[in-house]
């Protein structure tokens, strides 16, 4: 339901989550509570089982190994300013599979390959401010508690000068962000920083 009791939005079932560091499709519950005279305080809380990649309900994975929950707090109390804090806790464990391996006696045997690993815990902040409708600042920073690193940061400034001249400056920092069991960890990678500007 939407705007229940003028304070609450409720979503139940399969849905796409887009809440700062929390992104993905889950089967679960999403609640948004809106408070304040102008609904300037908003808190979204969500949780559930990660939807299978096939989006089918057959062979549904165990929730204890495939889940996603988190929250995002929004603030709109200052004119033309929006700020948000987010937290995401997600765990997706690949399905086990059978494969042929060589044992210590060099015999070919079939083994079941299983996976495990910690949940992915992320936190972030997003800021957006517009001044006099003409000038804008946007910034964000996302941190991975599991890997203990900042994996994304961004700052963007746009200014409108007299004669409708517009200038901008932008800084972006990125690190590849893989899940714990991803095959991409075997490859070398570099951090990426970009600085740009123009008029």
Specify the residue positions occupied by each region the protein language model found.
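Gram-negative and organellar
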Residues: 1-199
């Amino acid at each position: 339901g939407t705007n229940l009791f003028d304070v609450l939005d409720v979503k139940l079932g399969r849905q796409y989550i887009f809440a700062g560091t929390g992104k993905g499709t889950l089967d679960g519950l999403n609640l948004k509570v809106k408070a304040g005279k102008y609904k300037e305080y908003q808190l979204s809380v969500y949780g559930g089982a990660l939807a299978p990649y096939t989006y089918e309900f057959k062979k549904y994975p165990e929730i204890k190994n495939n889940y996603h929950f988190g929250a995002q707090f929004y603030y709109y109390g200052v004119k033309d300013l929006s700020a948000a804090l987010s937290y995401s806790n997600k765990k997706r464990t690949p399905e086990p599979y059978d494969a042929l391996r060589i044992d210590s006696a060099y015999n070919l045997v079939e083994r079941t390959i299983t996976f495990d690993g910690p949940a992915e815990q992320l936190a972030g902040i997003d800021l957006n401010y517009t001044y006099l409708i003409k000038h804008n600042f946007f910034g964000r920073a996302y941190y991975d508690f599991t890997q203990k690193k900042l994996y994304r940061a961004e700052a963007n400034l746009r200014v409108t000068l007299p004669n409708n001249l517009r200038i901008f400056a932008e800084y972006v920092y990125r690190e590849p962000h893989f899940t714990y069991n991803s095959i991409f960890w075997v490859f070398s990678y570099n951090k990426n920083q970009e600085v740009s500007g123009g008029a």
